Structure formats: C-alpha cells, structure tokens
C-alpha cells in the first residue's frame, strides 16, 4: 500500500468516530474535555458552533455519535455523549454576550426562510450576523416547527426551545408568525428576496388504508395527534390504546397517551425487534413506563361495532431472514383481534408542498420530494434552497442543522454572485501533546466505569402533569464520572517513520495489538497479516513510509486503537507522538471572510 496521506483532513477526522458520525461534525472530545474542567459555558459554545441548539439536542438528538463511539468497542455501552451535551447547557452561565450579533449596517441582500423549524433557524443563525436581512415566514403562531409540535413537553420543555430559538431571533431576524406561504410562485415573482430557503419539514403523516379506517373518529394520525396535544386541543384518550408503528414518533405517541389517561398502551410492530426504527433508548423509556411492545403483528382491519371502534384485527407473522440479516419473506400464521378504544397511526411521514407550483422550474422526484443538490442544497430553480425533512424526507434535528449550515454557505455565495461549488475545504490542525498523557487524559490508566444512567422522575410522579420533564439531567458530579469514560479519540498517534529504529517496543506494549511492523503488501494482504486481523473495512489502515533500517512498514489498525499513548511513552526515539487533531469546518462566515467580507464565525 502507499503511505497513508495523513495531511488529508478526512483521515484523522474519521478516526474521531463520534465527530465523523455527527452530521454537523460537533467536536465531541473537545467539549467533553471542557466539561471535565468545569468550563460549562465554553463547552456550550463549542457545541453551538456546529449544532446550534445544545440544550435541545442534549435532550432529543437521535445520537448518531453514540453507536460510533470507540468506547463501545472496549465495553458494551458508549459514552453518554448526548446527555453530556445537556450538561453543558444545564450548567452554563449567561452566554448572551458571547453570541453573534447582527451588524447595524446591512449588506443589501434579503433572504426569505419558509418555516421556523431547526433548518431555517440555522440558516438565520449563520446569515444574520453577515448583514443579511432575514425574514422567517411561519404558518403557526409559534416557532420551532416539529420540535415544538411533535416532541412532547415531558421530553423537551418549551422554555428550552424558547431560549435557544430566542438567541437567533435576537439577531435582528424578522419573524412573521401566522403567515403561511400560499404560493411560492407569488413569493418569487415579488422579487423582494434575493434567495429563498424552504424548511417546512415533512408535515403529512402516513395513513393506513384498511377496512374500517374512516368509520370512527378514534383513529388518529400520529403527528397530527401530537400537534393537537401540544396546542391543548386534545387532553384525553381512551383507556386502551394501540399505536401502529415502531419509530420514534410511535414512542412519543405511546408515552403521551399514558399522560392523557390511557391505562393499557400497546405498540404494535409488524417485524421483530431487531428491525425497529425507534432508537434503543426510546424503546427503553417506553418500556420503563410499562408500554407493551408487541412484535410480528401486521395490521389487517379496524374492527367497528355500531359505529364504535372496539379493536383491530392483526395477522400474526413469521419471517424468514436471509444470510445478510434481511427479512426475506413473511408468512401469516394466525389472526388475532386486540380490543382498543383508540388507534394512533405512527407509520411515517411524507413531504407536502401544495403551495409549490409545479410549473416554476422546481423538479420533484417520484416520492414528491424536490430534487436537491446534496452539497449546495439548491433545487433545480436557481436561488431556491431546501433543508431538513423538506429536502430529503424525514431524518432528525441534527441533520436539519447540518443542512442549514450548508444552505447558508450556498445562499451567501448565490447572493454574492459566487460559484456555489467553490467551497472552502475542511482543514485539520495538529498540536503536540509531548508532555505525556497527563496533559490530556482524565487518568493514567483505563477507567473501567460503566455508563451512567440518566436519573428520571419517579414513575408515581411523572404522570401527574403532561409537562413534567422525565429526565433530570446529570449533576456536575455525575458528569465528571461520565466524562472520564471518554477515550480522547482526537488525541492522535502520529508516526514519523525516519525516527523508528524497529525496536518493537510499541508493538509489545500496545494493549489492543493494533500495531504491526511487516513487509508491505496490498490492503487485503496486510489486513490478514496484522497482529490482530483488521476486520472493519470501514476504518482505514495507517501505513507508514518504508522504515530506514529494513524497508518494512509500520501498520496500525485505527479501528482497534484506544488512544492510550503507551506507544508514545515507550518509544525511545520519539517516532510516536500524541497530537491533538482539530477539524476546521468552514461556515458561511468563513466563506465571507475568505472573500474579503465579514469576518468571524456565524455560529460562534
């Protein structure tokens, strides 16, 4: 193999698995270190640079970082990354004087953001400090989009939403509530705005067209029902409730039902548990509240008697799974009727754009989603950009934030007459930690502590009111115990081949056998010849230049490395060094600064 190009920013970025997995590329190890030092406000601002809403995401993020966490390779559970984000938000001081502000003198460009959800708010966060006149059009009488209407208050308190959204609106953003856009064509033809961003989410819940569907008012669409609960249009439900679907919305529906008076709630899943879309922690939280999750039941018919919903008919399924772990086929082996008073359908969401005319140059695909460039976020009509669920269908908040950052860059470039594709690349900065692991690690040995459980409000107390937040958050002391589980994956092992004397000291001391000195070969050959076979092809091998004494190469399996620094401490020549990698992510402010405009970070 050719020597690894460690100058490529993506190489060390991928080694920091949590940051690489985060769509917004939040610098997780850095903010965890700041928490460890008691610098909660700094940790909050480090989060805010990339994910904009630390307090919100510290409660409801889908956590793509945690399955990627390297800690999960040395024991069962990853670091509680998401909950540590909340620690930064809960324990910070007043940070308003550290937030970006809008300049008094505008740059003469106006942008319209349709929808006041997380994607649009991220665009506003990035563009308002650059002098853009930002107008947000929101159909509802409140901000937050699906964060407010579809995430229950017992998970995400309104005061948290209001505070973090307020930080952005205070940047001289013109917010027009109760102002739906009825016609995109009319908005564009007005020539009032230089660019338009669509961040309206995926607001249409999927229906289930089965016999009896329209014969009872007690059959509800999940996201519509949650919205009605959020606005207090619904405050009760029957004692026996069936939830159809097993995604995160289904989990919110079943737990909300309990708070409205349901006594017996069942989540009905067509497939086995291993195929669920809901996050593991969402399932655990529902089961803690005694929700019954029933697998292998495929809905067949709503049972109506004398105009009243009395139950649902299900096929009981058995599934064959192929060698790749996918369901090959399903067979109905029985039929069962389960009594109920209400049914809530939570089987997915779709985009809905009745207000976007189909003759204005915006192309839609077969699923009625706009055709959007995944880099620039612009659709097939110049000057119109999409992000969040409205761009590529339902995902989650952190994806919407990432889309918002990219769209803001593109909108800035579009308004300034620049090439949208000509974007600043990611950078990487390496700084030595030569003084030993005490300079960066939490302890001089591996910390075997198990993941801390989030403390919850007692079951007897949490159902008294619908807005009692269940998760209490970590105390500062509890946070300290959890941060010590972080392996500091951004402290990289950096190798200098010309200094190596091939003494094998690093190989001998490595606790995971991730190092091998061997003759070079192709990748498949090297993976088989390592001290411990490198089976994870998604994680690259590090291969050095030829070593000066024998011409052999140093090979490192990045997948196994736990960044313990023993190789660097043992090396007699300094060939191994521990260096902190910092990924430099460009935002709209950086693009403006590079072009000679406003300086500073829009997400600071």
Regions found by a protein language model. Name each.
Residues 1-8, 79, 85-107, 133, ...:
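Flanking helices and flexible, charged tails adjoining ferredoxin-like Fe-S electron-transfer domains
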Residues 105, 110-114, 162-210, 301-313, ...:
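Feature captures the FAD/FMN-dependent oxidoreductase FAD-binding
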């Amino acid at each position: 193999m050719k020597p690894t190009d460690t100058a490529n920013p993506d190489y060390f970025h991928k080694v920091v698995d949590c940051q690489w997995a985060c769509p917004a590329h939040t610098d997780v190890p850095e903010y965890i270190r700041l928490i460890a030092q008691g610098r909660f406000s700094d940790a909050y601002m480090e989060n805010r640079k990339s994910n904009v809403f630390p307090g919100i995401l510290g409660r409801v993020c889908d956590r793509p970082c945690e399955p990627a966490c390297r800690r999960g390779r040395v024991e069962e559970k990853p670091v509680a990354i998401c909950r540590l984000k909340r620690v930064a938000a809960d324990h910070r001081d007043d940070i308003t004087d550290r937030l970006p502000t809008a300049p008094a003198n505008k740059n003469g460009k106006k942008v319209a953001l349709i929808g006041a959800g997380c994607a649009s708010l991220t665009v506003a966060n990035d563009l308002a400090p650059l002098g853009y006149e930002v107008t947000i059009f929101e159909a509802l009488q409140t901000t937050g989009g699906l964060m407010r209407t579809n995430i229950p208050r017992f998970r995400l308190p309104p005061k948290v939403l209001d505070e973090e959204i307020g930080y952005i609106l205070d940047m001289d953003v013109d917010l027009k509530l109760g102002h739906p856009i009825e016609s995109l064509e009319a908005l564009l033809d007005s020539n009032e705005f230089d660019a338009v961003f669509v961040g309206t989410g995926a607001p249409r819940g999927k229906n289930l067209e089965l016999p009896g569907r329209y014969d009872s008012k007690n059959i509800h669409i999940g996201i519509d029902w949650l919205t009605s609960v959020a606005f207090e249009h619904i405050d009760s439900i029957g004692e026996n409730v069936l939830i159809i679907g097993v995604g995160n919305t289904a989990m919110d529906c079943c737990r909300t039902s309990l708070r409205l008076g349901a006594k017996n709630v069942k989540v009905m899943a067509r497939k086995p548990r291993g195929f669920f879309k809901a996050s593991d922690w969402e399932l655990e939280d529902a089961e803690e509240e005694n929700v019954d999750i029933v697998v292998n039941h495929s809905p067949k018919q709503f049972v109506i008697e004398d105009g009243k919903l009395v139950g649902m008919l299900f096929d009981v399924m058995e599934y064959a799974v192929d060698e790749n772990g996918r369901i090959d086929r399903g067979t109905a082996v029985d039929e069962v009727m389960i009594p109920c008073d209400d049914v809530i359908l939570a089987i997915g969401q779709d985009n809905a754009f009745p207000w976007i005319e189909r003759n204005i140059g915006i192309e839609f695909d077969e699923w009625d989603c706009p055709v959007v460039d995944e880099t620039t976020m612009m659709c097939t009509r110049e000057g119109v950009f999409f992000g969040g669920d409205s761009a590529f269908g339902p995902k989650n908040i952190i994806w919407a934030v990432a889309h918002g950052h990219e769209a803001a860059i593109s909108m800035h470039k579009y308004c300034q007459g620049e090439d949208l594709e000509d974007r600043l690349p990611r950078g990487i900065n390496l700084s030595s930690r030569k003084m030993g692991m005490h300079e960066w690690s939490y302890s001089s040995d591996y910390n075997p502590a198990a993941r801390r459980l989030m403390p919850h409000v007692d079951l007897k107390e949490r159902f008294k009111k619908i807005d009692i937040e269940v998760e209490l958050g970590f105390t500062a002391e509890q946070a300290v115990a959890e941060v010590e589980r972080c392996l500091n994956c951004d402290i990289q092992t950096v190798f200098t081949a010309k200094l190596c004397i091939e003494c094998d000291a690093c190989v001998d001391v490595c606790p995971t056998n991730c190092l091998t000195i061997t003759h070079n070969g192709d990748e498949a050959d090297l993976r088989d010849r390592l001290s411990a076979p490198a089976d994870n092809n998604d994680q690259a091998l590090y291969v050095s230049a030829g070593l000066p004494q024998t011409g052999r190469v140093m090979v490192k399996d990045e997948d196994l490395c736990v960044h313990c620094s023993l190789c660097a401490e043992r090396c007699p020549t300094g060939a191994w060094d521990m260096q902190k990698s910092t990924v430099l992510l460009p935002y709209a402010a950086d693009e403006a600064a590079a072009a000679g405009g406003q300086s500073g970070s829009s997400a600071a």
